[in-house]
Amino acid sequence: DHTMILDLNITEYIRSLMKEEKNDLSHIESEARVNHVPIVKPETKELLRTLVLLKKPMKILEVGAAVGFSSLYMNSYQPEGGTIITIERNEKRIKKAKENIKNQGKEEQITLLEGDAIEILKGLDGSFDLIFVDAAKGQYIHFLDDVLRLLAPEGVLVSDNVLQDGDVARSRYAIERRDRTIHKRMRDYLYTIKNHPQLETTILPVGDGVAISIKMGESNERR
């Protein structure tokens, strides 16, 4: 959590203003941070809350459950009767996510699908008001076709960690060779969602970079 794309003083000041939440998920959040589980950064969490309160999504799809924290968090701000489908492939995290969802009494609201997101997305149908992608960064570009198919008109796509601690802005030659494929794929992803005829996208330097895309209806598509 030490790598920041914003000045550390600004980040710490923003975090100092954060208030207690109405939900009781702080123990799940702090345990995940202590164990270096990659959950959303505090300021990204607040952005998610704002988007859920604005959009009032009845159906959310999450790619990358980790230990279930962000699903539980988003669900606590969804309208009554709102549901979430979340996907995770890491067995250790799946076990913890199931435990957390059960302990919060949210098994009716949150469905955890286990396995590879690319395969699971292909098999899903229906329409989601908000889709949150927070998984392996090199896979975002491979998720996109199915994510767009599953996103409702005027639905919101939130992609987390898109600035890669600032690396995405650097030349590929400044990136370690082993990270260059991910670097290229994320750049391709950001270019695609910024220029896609169905999407209006803004990229924010929040947390480790968040892209927010709105799926335009047929009549509103960019000319």
What are these regions (language model features)?
Residues D1-L130, K137-V158, V162-R223:
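A short alpha-helical cap/connector motif
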